[in-house]
UniProtKB/Swiss-Prot annotation:
It is an enzyme of class 2 (transferase). Belongs to the ThiI family. SMART domains: THUMP. It comes from Acholeplasma laidlawii (strain PG-8A). InterPro entries: Rossmann-like_a/b/a_fold (IPR014729), ThiI_AANH (IPR020536), ThiI_fer (IPR054173), ThiI_N (IPR049961), THUMP_dom (IPR004114), THUMP_ThiI (IPR049962), tRNA_STrfase (IPR003720), tRNA_sulfurtransferase_ThiI (IPR050102). Its EC number is 2.8.1.4. Catalyzes the ATP-dependent transfer of a sulfur to tRNA to produce 4-thiouridine in position 8 of tRNAs, which functions as a near-UV photosensor. Also catalyzes the transfer of sulfur to the sulfur carrier protein ThiS, forming ThiS-thiocarboxylate. This is a step in the synthesis of thiazole, in the thiamine biosynthesis pathway. The sulfur is donated as persulfide by IscS. GO terms for molecular function: ATP binding; CCA tRNA nucleotidyltransferase activity; tRNA binding; tRNA-uracil-4 sulfurtransferase activity. GO terms for cellular component: cytosol. This is Probable tRNA sulfurtransferase.
């Protein structure tokens, strides 16, 4: 029997006149993800059939699981429109795909309106031919454990059992570009993933304070980027490493203890906005969730984002921590994020961080040191890596800080 994968689109059905553009982008992204697998495609309106060798089945499903814009997919089998042929294929599919005993229902969709039988009649006829062959099948119309779907179309009949959930959302490439302020923690990788799922093409922006912080903290971010790269159409993602050490030292030296995190994050936002504007990125993205820490109260968020005018997206802003953790486990970043290596946000935590900062006091704290030249110097020395899922780079083996390590690595 002829086997393929049926791909169904997700939120694309909502896009009206823009729908062809979105479908074109998702076709492009699917082709890119499956370029190393021997497959063929059949494109029909709002669905895609992927034809493949059985030996590649697991790899095809794995790669499709990384493509945003797909709502679900199913293993699907094709035959003619002859009732006897449909019933015979249904038996073979049940033997192959269904675990018995189970309650059972056949649902038919008939798009070929010239076919002599109506949808319900097709279901009844096929059921009468199939059920005698299986002792473990019991008809249950209202709430069956198993549904056998029959789609009778002009070119033939398709049969499948069940749907494999996919990412949903929109295809990357049509939603603009964003700069993710990526720490080594749990939240920001999830924020990056959620934005990618919604079609945003992201780059990663990490503030590193080596040697104040260990190189292992940067290694964490590299490993997280490798996981996120799976969800891009071309299996690669840009990671920008921003040298924050001098700014960090100045903040620790001059800023009052309760305001250290507030001022540090204001510097993050300034750097992110300048870099985004210089490189054609439309928005900043972060992993802030209201009230989780002192710097994420509404008062703190208001004061911190006061230094920017660029849009700031916070996809996990209302998520519970457990919800964020569950997503991080699903995208395989959780075990990396909890590794015990401090970054610049966690290396020094004030005893009593301010939870209701004011803009006036923040400006007063910033007036204690000259930070503009420090920001300019940091931006001039950003180190950019192109990360893929197979990037093999142990940063601690190449130097004592990021600049030395990357310089040594590129010379090898």
């Amino acid at each position: 029997m002829e086997k393929a994968i049926l791909i169904r689109f997700g939120d694309l059905v909502l896009k009206g006149k823009n729908k062809p553009k979105f479908i074109g982008q998702i076709k492009k992204n699917i082709r890119s993800k499956l370029k190393n697998v021997n497959v063929e495609y059949t494109f029909q309106h709002d669905r895609i059939y992927v034809h493949f060798n059985e030996v590649d089945s697991d790899e095809v499903i794995k790669q499709l699981g990384y493509v945003s814009g797909i709502h679900s997919f199913s293993y699907i089998y094709k035959t003619t429109k002859d009732i006897e042929s449909i019933a015979q294929l249904a038996k073979e599919v049940i033997q192959k795909e269904v675990k018995l005993p189970t309650t059972f229902k056949i649902e038919t969709k008939r798009t070929d309106k010239n076919y002599p039988l109506k949808s319900l009649e097709i279901s009844q006829k096929v059921a009468s031919l199939v059920l005698p062959s299986f002792d473990g099948l019991k008809v249950e119309v209202r709430n069956p454990e198993t549904v056998l779907d029959i789609e009778l179309r002009s070119e033939g009949t398709y049969i499948y059992v069940g749907k494999i959930p996919a990412l949903g959302g929109f295809p990357i490439g049509l939603g603009g570009k964003g700069l993710v302020m990526l720490s080594g923690g749990i939240d920001s990788p999830v924020a990056a993933h959620l934005m990618m799922k919604q079609g945003i093409d992201v780059e990663l922006f990490h503030f590193e304070s080596t040697p104040l912080t260990p190189l292992e903290s940067v290694q964490k971010v590299i490993e997280i980027a490798k996981k996120l790269a799976y969800y891009t159409p071309y299996n690669k993602i840009k990671l920008h490493l921003v040298p924050f050490t001098k700014i960090h030292e100045a903040i620790l030296s001059y800023v009052a203890d309760p305001y250290i995190i507030t001022i540090m994050r204001r510097m993050f936002y300034r750097l992110g906005e300048i870099y985004a504007n210089q490189h054609g990125l439309d928005t900043l993205i972060n992993g802030e969730s209201v009230g989780q820490v002192a710097s994420q109260t509404l008062s703190s968020i208001k004061v911190i984002e006061n230094v920017t005018s660029i849009p700031i997206l916070r996809p996990v802003i209302t998520y519970d921590k457990n919800d964020i953790i569950n997503i991080s486990k699903k995208i395989d970043t959780y075990d990396i994020s909890i590794l015990p290596f401090n970054d610049c946000c966690s290396i020094y935590v004030p005893r009593n961080p301010v939870t209701k900062p004011t803009i006036d006091q923040a400006l007063k704290e910033e007036s204690r040191f000259e930070f503009k030249e420090l920001l300019e110097d940091a931006l001039k020395n950003v180190q950019t890596m192109i990360i893929t899922p197979t990037t093999d780079f142990e940063i601690a083996l190449h130097g004592f800080d990021v600049k030395d390590a990357l310089s040594s690595y590129t010379q090898e």
